[in-house]
Amino acid sequence: MATLRVSSLFASSSSSLHSNPSVFTKYQSSPKWAFSFPVTPLCSKRSKRIVHCIAGDTLGLTRPNESDAPKISIGAKDTAVVQWQGDLLAIGATENDMARDENSKFKNPLLQQLDSELNGLLSAASSEEDFSGKSGQSVNLRFPGGRITLVGLGSSASSPTSYHSLGQAAAAAAKSSQARNIAVALASTDGLSAESKINSASAIATGVVLGSFEDNRFRSESKKSTLESLDILGLGTGPEIERKIKYAEHVCAGVILGRELVNAPANIVTPAVLAEEAKKIASTYSDVISVNILDAEQCKELKMGAYLAVAAAATENPPYFIHLCFKTPTKERKTKLALVGKGLTFDSGGYNLKVGAGSRIELMKNDMGGAAAVLGAAKALGEIRPSRVEVHFIVAACENMISAEGMRPGDIVTASNGKTIEVNNTDAEGRLTLADALIYACNQGVEKIIDLATLTGAIMVALGPSVAGAFTPNDDLAREVVEAAEASGEKLWRMPMEESYWESMKSGVADMINTGPGNGGAITGALFLKQFVDEKVQWLHLDVAGPVWSDEKKNATGYGVSTLVEWVLRN
């Protein structure tokens, strides 16, 4: 094999992920900012001007550094693996690929050829490290000119998750060796159709980009990624695979935005900052995305009593109701969709205060994980520009705090459809904000709605930290979303909508209470939301309380962006 060394950069598929800096970095020189929002025709024809303290008055005087998203040139190449030149070569191998003959030589032709070029070092290293191709295994060979990494794919590499893991392992190896130019290949592509190869290349690219990303905005010192280029070898070339790789780059940009929004603490990301981020997305893609932001007075005109009750205590950080609309100027009929995200930028629990070590109150900055996914999807779709859909992105952003003005246990609030809710737990606030958001979404004339919310701890008891729960009374919509998630490599599981449980949600003095008994909490939460969706609208609720955050990495995951984008494109 030719010595691994730095080769000249190639020009194809130049990537500039997240080229527009996040709004989090725009407030470093001025303690105040002001912006004006257009008011929807439902409220008024006038424009309101809002002034809000940020950055200079931030608790702790924290001011984020610039976002440092990966900028990697990605291309599919037909270069033979043994002829490739660069810093690091990563090979994905299944357990079957690692089979040996009676002389302990690889049966796999590519591994056999590589081992021959390396005078048996690949075979020796994999034996010494007990590398058998199992998922999660890897072995590294270092040379004066570079490195080769073998990555285990398990019994078979049949899902996007396997290829994401391969890309992430390659990114980790590149990071540890400070590689600038890397390549990724599969030991065998037998049995992969042309379409499967294209999808595999896209998943590998996704894994490398997201695996290279580190959120260093809040570190006093950070080490920037050295990775500049990725070659994907042996999976084909041409416009189709390049388009799919570009699609992966756009989705990754949305995922990274989602991660940054959730990672940023509540003293940085307030409801107003979420609104400004939405404005920035609309400004960047102004030919296809419009924006309306409603303040508290305008929400009051729309009778959003449930949402405003949650927001009432946060007098220093007032609520903003965000509505983005994606629509290309083509005349063809468009399917009308809505993506609704829970947008609690911080959740103290209110008077039902989150207390004790198990409350995880310190992580309640991630209670806007649904909103982050919705805004990340808006950014990605602004780049991808599908022509046959009209998509409404809706977030009722606010904080759930404690004050004399705040909502109390036992209060009765009225949603914008006239239904009354007895608040028996102020810490079940997300569903109250979503109630008015779902009503608003239905009023846009949409045909289908997906809402995403870090709604219940019960879903984590049922499904653990990595899997979202999907609730819908519509089998067709369930199938659409499950297929989109599978194609994206995100995990979800359809849960039952047990209607008999609704009896436990009835109030003695109002139409309903906002929480039921302890058992089946994820189901009763979904049944609550159903009360605010028009029967003519197909609706699915994703409880993403588990997968929006990685305890292992102590970081946001950007969960939901990929599935939402894939689902929109399939409509």
UniProtKB/Swiss-Prot annotation:
Ligand binding (Mg(2+) 1): 342, 347, 367, 429
Regions crossing the membrane: none
Effect of residue 431 to A: Abolished activity but normal chaperone abilities
Cellular component annotations (GO), alphabetically ordered: chloroplast; cytoplasm
Annotated localization: Plastid, Chloroplast
Keyword Transit peptide among record annotations: yes
Catalytic activity: Release of an N-terminal amino acid, Xaa-|-Yaa-, in which Xaa is preferably Leu, but may be other amino acids including Pro although not Arg or Lys, and Yaa may be Pro. Amino acid amides and methyl esters are also readily hydrolyzed, but rates on arylamides are exceedingly low; Release of N-terminal proline from a peptide
Effect of residue 354 to E: Lost ability to form homohexamers leading to impaired activity toward Leu-Leu as substrate, but increased chaperone abilities
EC nos: 3.4.11.1, 3.4.11.5
This protein's UniProt keywords: Aminopeptidase, Chaperone, Chloroplast, Hydrolase, Magnesium, Metal-binding, Plastid, Protease, Stress response, Transit peptide
Residues the record marks as active site: 354, 431
Effect of residue 347 to R: Strongly reduced activity, but increased chaperone abilities
Binding positions for Mg(2+) 2 per the UniProt entry: 347, 427, 429
A Pfam family matched in the record: Peptidase_M17_N
Source species, domain of life: Eukaryota
Tissues expressing the protein: Observed during floral development. Expressed in healthy and senescent leaves, cotyledons (emergence from seed coats), pistils, sepals, petals, stamens, and floral buds (at protein level). Present at very low levels in healthy leaves.
Disruption phenotype: No visible phenotype on plants, flowers and fruits development, as well as normal defense responses to P.syringae pv. tomato and no impact on insect growth (e.g. larvae of M.sexta).
Activity-pH behavior: Optimum pH is 9.2.
Cofactor note: Binds 2 Mg(2+) ions per subunit.
Outcome (variant: residue 354 to G/W/N): Reduced stability
Name listed for the protein in its UniProt record: Leucine aminopeptidase A1, chloroplastic
Biological classification of the source: Eukaryota, Viridiplantae, Streptophyta, Embryophyta, Tracheophyta
Name of the gene encoding the protein in the UniProt record: LAPA1
